[in-house]
């Protein structure tokens, strides 16, 4: 039963990056929308889910306080980790034997593309 906003999923991410709580929260919230919340296994949303990111600041980098180049680099790395984890969660979902990725191109907006992709992967008539 994984169809997040978020659903039956626990994700714990740690980093030694020096980043403010506000920037870390912003990065995680935006990334969860584009990774975990796009996963569906059976179309049912459950209530047991959580994603936590902890940063201890020990990397020695300049503190990330703004949405600058360092912040974008952090977001890119966070996206790579969360994308990999989200795909693993889908692949390991109850009864999963295949992993399908739906890519929508040339959409008018990201929101439209997401709605279309969710409609396609949510169809019970698709047989792979």
Over which residues does each language-model region extend?
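N-terminal loops that bind phosphate or other acidic moieties
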Residues: 1-112, 116
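Conserved small/polar residues in nucleotide/adenosyl-binding loops
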Residues: 126-128
């Amino acid at each position: 039963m994984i169809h997040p906003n978020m659903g039956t999923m626990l994700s714990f991410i740690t980093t030694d990056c020096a980043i403010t709580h506000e920037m870390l929260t912003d990065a995680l919230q935006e990334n969860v929308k584009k990774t975990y919340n796009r996963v569906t296994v059976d179309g049912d949303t459950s209530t047991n889910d959580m994603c936590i990111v902890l940063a201890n600041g020990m990397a020695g980098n300049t503190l990330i306080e703004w949405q600058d180049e360092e912040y974008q680099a952090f977001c890119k790395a966070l996206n790579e980790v969360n994308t990999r984890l989200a795909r693993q969660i889908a692949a390991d979902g109850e009864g999963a034997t295949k992993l399908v990725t739906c890519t929508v191109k040339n959409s008018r907006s990201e929101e439209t593309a997401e709605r279309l992709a969710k409609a396609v992967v949510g169809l019970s008539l698709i047989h792979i």
